[in-house]
C-alpha cells in the first residue's frame, strides 16, 4: 500500500535542558558566561557530585561527556566541567512558549515530549513544494531563536518517522530533509542503533546476525528479521528501515479521551479507615488502568483521581505530568498524591466530615506509544530520584501487601488483589 504524501515537520530543541538553564542564568546575571559556550552540563547534585548527566553543552561533548553517564565519570573526562542543577519550572516555561509558537503554524500539532513536536503542514505547503518547506522551516527556527533565545532543529519529510530521523542529523540550528528517495544515501549508512524505535536490545540481537547498519536491516529478508525479533517487531524494523510509516500527526483533540477504572465500596471510607481500605484499592485500580493502556498500546499524560460521597456527589482532582506514561507505579504515585490533596488536605473532604463510597483512577490525554518516546524531562527526574524511589518502593509494597491481607480478612478473600 502506498504511503500518503504529507508535509511533516519534526521540531526538536537543541540541548533543551542545558539551553534553558543557560537562558535563565543569563536573565538573572547578564554578565555571566553562557553555559552553551563552555563545557557544562545539567544533572545530579552539584555539591555532592552524585547523580547522572541529563544534558550537556556542545563543548562538553568534545570531551566525551555523555547524557546518562554518572557525574563522577563526566568530571573525570572534563575536570573543569561546570555543573548546574535541574530547574523543572524553567523547563516547563520554555516548553509552553515553544508550543505556543508552533501552534500558530498549524492546528495539526502533536507534542511528543517537553522539547519536541510533530507538525502536519500539508494544508499550508503542498508535499511537492519542497522549497517552500525549507523556507518555512527556516522561519520557524528564526522565530524561536529571536523570540525565545534558544535553537531548534527541524526535520522535514513525508512521514513522521523520516522527519524524526532527519531532525537528529547534524546540530545545532539546522534544517534537514529525509524524503523517501533520500533514505538510501542519508539513512541506510547509519548504525542500526540509530534507527528510531530500535532499542539497545533489539540492535544487539540484529548485530549478532550481521545486521550492523539501517541499510542491512532494510535489505534483510523479512523472515530473518521476524525469526530474530518476533513477527511484530521484525515487521516494524523492516518497515522503519525502509522509511515506511503510516503514523499520523494526532492533535490532542483527536486522541482517545481516557482510560479509567472505578470501584464502589460496601462501606464508607473516612479518615479512620483510609489507610487500610482506600490505599489497596487505589493500588489495584492503578494497575488495572496501566494494564489497559499497555494492551491498547497507549500512554497518557493527565492522571485523575475521583470519588463519590455517601450522598452521591462526585469530587475529583487531576494533574498533568511532564511525560507520557503507562506505568502502574507512576499512575499510582500520582493518584495517591491527588487523593491526599482531595481527602486529607486542610480543605479535604475528610476535614469536612464527608465520607466516600466510590474511588476511581483515570488517565487521559492519550497518544499511541509507537511514536511516543520517553520524555527527557521525566527521565531526568527519574534518574535524580532513582535511589530514593527504590527504597520507598520496597517499604510501600510491604505495607500494601499487609493492607491487602487485612482488607481481604475483613471482607473476604479476593476482595482486593494485585491487578493482572
For each predicted feature, which ranges?
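Gly/Gly-Pro- and Ser/Thr-rich, intrinsically disordered tail segments characteristic of DNA damage-repair
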Residues: 1-239, 383-420
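DNA-contacting surface of Y-family translesion DNA polymerases
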Residues: 2-3, 10, 194, 204-353, ...
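Short, charged/polar surface micro-motifs in flexible loops or helix N-caps
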Residues: 14-16, 46-49, 310-313, 366-369
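Acidic, metal-coordinating catalytic segment for phosphate/diphosphate chemistry
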Residues: 20, 323-420
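Short Gly/Ser/Thr- and Asp/Glu-enriched loop/turn motifs at secondary-structure junctions
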Residues: 112-116, 157-160, 254, 298-302, ...
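Short loop/turn motifs enriched for small/polar and acidic residues
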Residues: 122, 157-159, 308, 359-366
